[in-house]
Structure formats: structure tokens, C-alpha cells
A protein has these predicted regions:
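Ubiquitous "structural anchor" signal
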Residues: 30, 36, 60, 183-184, ...
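Intrinsically disordered, low-complexity terminal tails and inter-domain linkers enriched
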Residues: 142-146, 379-420
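Extended hydrophobic packing segments that form well-structured cores
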Residues: 130, 333-384, 388, 418-423
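Generic N-terminal targeting/processing segments that precede catalytic cores or assembly contacts
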Residues: 1-165, 169-171, 367
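A structural signal for small-residue-enriched, beta-sheet-centric alpha/beta enzyme cores
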Residues: 8, 16, 171-177, 182-331, ...
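Generic domain-boundary/flexible-linker signal
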Residues: 113, 163, 224, 269-271, ...
């Protein structure tokens, strides 16, 4: 059968795209409906996806009985480290009096919490895949000249097991994985999918009534917030490198405030206006720290030493010996506050706490103490919305104080939004 050969370049790598669980379900629906209505078992199908690409899909594992037929598609995630890669997505189609009804069966989760794509009680088959499934069912009906209706039940037998390796239970999706995809295509290591997963976590918290948001780039920030600041790690949303986009998403979700707890190695970049802290986007840690030290009277020799520091933690003793550590950190956090407020543009209050694992709190933005008090009260009285979970940020060797996040995407492809690259 013809293979799906569509590639993207990520860094210096050429990676093959795959297709989403939604595309699999739509193709399986076409196969099952065609078998039910005409008796023909199609060996393959070409599915038009919302991305504009047509995907060739092999149809397999046919079965039929009185009034129903079933077909399966084996998920191909391409080069994306997707937990559902290789899983079989089934569609069982039966005749009804009219219309097309779509539901989930074994291995497809059920929504139990507001704020997700589908209402509480519905199968976790998102809007775009539902539309794709309905379109393929109707295409089979037209081709067969059938004027009645069809009921489609999508099942993923491995979904119950796979869901244990995803964030679905934390988001309020129980009993299986989600059928996802907005473009029908899995783009390996897609930044859009990572940002969308963060935005979904924010919407779930907001729907649960959370107004004051706690954010950290990764595990270190989350653990510091809980262990040193007395905050609830269960309410911490991890933004990885996407500080600016997380602010945008928090504003869109309607939060009133947001506190970022992060290492100096991460947040010194934000103080320079770098809102995506991935090392391949920009660095500037040493330059920014050296500039603020110079503003506080650092000598030319000290500035040179700071510029030669490999990590920000290595720079801190130099500033302390020069007697300007506190002043430099105050200058950095003031600039950080300015950049956060500029990005928020008045839509919400954004503050930050800057720390180093070996040095503790290094600085706070102007309004951070007020947000800390609000979040401590929430921690004492509410409990968490969801356990924190790390997110791979692809940071450099330091990212300057060990704020290296390690979200195991290969073991959790159906993450908060869903599959890592499913768009």
C-alpha cells in the first residue's frame, strides 16, 4: 500500500509526519460503513484531512454481524514519540433511522470535568475528529445510495492501558484515551501541540474556579514552590520554555493573576525580553546578568568573569564576593517584572519569584508577595487541581540552574492536550 510520506524539519533532523487518532477513526468509519452498506471490504482509503493533505490509510481487521460492521486502522505516528503509535483504532457502524451519531466504546475516555473540548459525560472524541468521522460516514452513505442513518462507536482496545501513561486522568478524562487532532496530521515534536497542551491545562483550572495561577518552567520550579514557598504543587502548571505564550493563554482563559516561580537560569532570559527560553531560540543569560551587574558598579574584570561563566549559578559567588549580589538581583527582577507586565498588557497581573537551588530565593518582582499570600491561602484551603508534571524543554546543558524539564512524551503521548504532535 502507498505510504504516507510527508516530512518536517526539526532542528537539523528530517522527520516523517504521521496521522492522528481522529484520522484513524475517520478511515475506520469509512471502511466499516462501506462494508455494512455494500458488502465491500476496502483494502485502503485516502482521507482528506483539515490540513489539506490526503492521507493513504490501510483498512484492516474487518468483522460484521447482523446490522453492523467493523473496521480497524493501525495508528502511524510517523517519527513522533507517541504513546498510541501502533495501536488499533476501531469503528463499529450500525444502521439507525436517520442522522449520524458518534460515540466512544472500550478504551475511549469519558469526560468528567468541565473545561475540555467535549461536555461532561461525552466520549472524549474532540470536535474535529467527530466531524471527520461524520463526513466519512456520510460519504459511504452517499456512495451506497443509503437514506437511513448510522451509529458509529469508536474503540481503542489498548486505550485503557495507554491512558495510565497519559495526563487524561488528571484532566478528568476517565476510562481511556482521547480521539484527537485538529489538522489530522501528527507533526513530530510540534511546538504548537506543546503550547496547546499548556493552554488546555489552564482552561481546566479556570473551569474549576481557580483565579490565581501558579506556573513554573519545570520540576525544579514546581518543587521549590512547594517545598520552600509553601505553595500547592498540585496546582502548578508547567510552562516549559513558553513563558510568553503561557501568559497569553492565561489572559485568554480569564485568570486574574499569575505567579511564575523559576530558576535564575530561566528567568534572566525573560528579563531580557526572551519569552521563549529554549536555548535554540536565544540565550543571553551571561550577557543579561553581566549588564545588570555593570549597572550596579561591577568592574570590567568582573564583567569579563561573568561573561566566562558557564552557568548562572557559577556567576553568583562572583557577584557575592564583589558585594553586589543583592543589588544585581534587584535589578534583574525589576527588569523581569517590566517584561512580564509588558507581555500581559494589563490583561492580568503577572509576578515572579526567582531562585537558585543552592541559594534559595534571589529576588521577587514588585507584587509577588501579594500573590504568594493568595496562593498560600489557596494551598491551605483548596488542594490542587492536578498533580504537576514536567515538560521536556530541550534546554541547554545548564539552562542555567538545572531547570531542565523531563516530560516523558514517549510515555505520555496523549498529554494534557493530547498527542505531542497531533494538530
Amino acid at each position: 500500500m502507498e505510504a504516507f510520506e510527508h516530512y518536517v524539519t526539526v532542528g537539523r533532523r528530517r522527520l516523517r509526519c504521521g496521522y492522528t487518532t481522529g484520522t484513524c477513526a475517520a478511515a475506520a468509519t469509512l471502511g466499516a460503513a462501506t462494508l455494512l452498506l455494500t458488502g465491500e471490504a476496502l483494502p485502503a482509503a485516502r482521507i482528506a484531512t483539515p490540513s489539506g493533505l490526503e492521507v493513504p490509510v490501510e483498512l484492516t481487521r474487518y468483522d460484521a454481524g447482523p446490522g453492523w460492521a467493523e473496521c480497524a486502522v493501525r495508528k502511524d505516528a510517523g517519527d513522533d514519540p507517541d504513546v498510541t503509535d501502533g495501536a488499533y483504532v476501531y469503528a463499529r457502524v450500525s444502521r439507525t433511522e436517520g442522522g449520524v451519531a458518534v460515540d466512544g466504546g472500550v478504551g475511549v475516555g469519558r469526560v468528567t470535568r468541565a473545561g475540555l473540548d467535549q461536555p461532561v459525560g461525552a466520549a472524549a472524541i474532540n470536535r474535529v475528529p467527530r466531524r471527520m468521522i461524520e463526513e466519512q460516514a456520510r460519504a459511504a452513505m452517499r456512495a451506497a445510495g443509503y437514506g437511513g442513518g448510522l451509529a458509529v462507536v469508536v474503540s481503542i482496545p489498548e486505550g485503557v492501558r495507554l491512558a495510565e501513561r497519559t495526563f487524561n486522568p488528571r484532566l478528568g478524562i476517565e476510562g481511556g484515551i482521547s480521539v484527537l487532532g485538529t489538522s489530522g496530521i501528527v507533526r513530530p515534536m510540534s511546538e504548537e501541540a506543546l503550547v496547546a497542551s499548556i493552554a488546555l491545562e489552564l482552561r481546566v483550572q479556570r473551569a474549576a474556579g481557580v483565579r490565581d495561577l501558579l506556573v513554573a518552567p519545570g520540576n525544579y520550579g514546581r518543587d521549590f514552590a512547594a517545598g520552600e514557598l509553601g505553595l500547592d504543587a498540585g496546582r502548578c502548571v508547567q510552562c516549559s520554555n513558553y513563558v510568553g505564550q503561557t501568559i497569553d493563554a492565561a489572559a485568554q482563559a480569564g485568570f486574574g493573576s499569575m505567579l511564575v516561580v523559576g530558576s535564575l537560569g530561566k528567568l534572566v532570559k525573560v528579563a531580557a525580553g526572551i519569552m521563549n527560553t529554549h536555548s535554540r531560540v536565544a540565550d543571553g543569560r551571561r550577557e543579561t546578568l553581566a549588564a545588570h551587574a555593570a549597572l550596579q558598579g561591577a568592574s570590567r574584570d568582573l564583567v569579563g568573569e561573568l561573561m566566562r561563566s558557564v552557568t548562572t549559578d557559577e556567576a553568583l559567588p562572583l557577584l557575592e564576593r564583589a558585594g553586589i549580589l543583592r543589588e544585581t538581583m534587584a535589578s534583574v527582577t525589576a527588569a523581569l517584572g517590566d517584561q512580564l507586565r509588558r507581555r500581559a498588557a494589563g490583561a492580568l497581573d503577572v509576578e515572579a519569584v526567582v531562585f537558585s537551588p543552592g541559594w534559595g530565593v534571589l529576588g521577587e518582582t514588585e507584587g509577588a508577595s501579594h500573590l504568594l499570600a493568595l496562593l498560600r491561602r489557596a494551598a491551605a484551603g483548596e488542594g490542587g487541581v492536578r498533580p504537576g508534571a514536567s515538560m521536556d524543554d530541550g534546554a541547554g546543558p545548564d539552562d542555567a540552574s538545572g531547570e531542565k524539564d523531563v516530560r516523558p512524551w514517549a510515555a505520555g503521548g496523549e498529554g494534557p492536550r493530547g498527542l505531542r504532535g497531533e494538530l
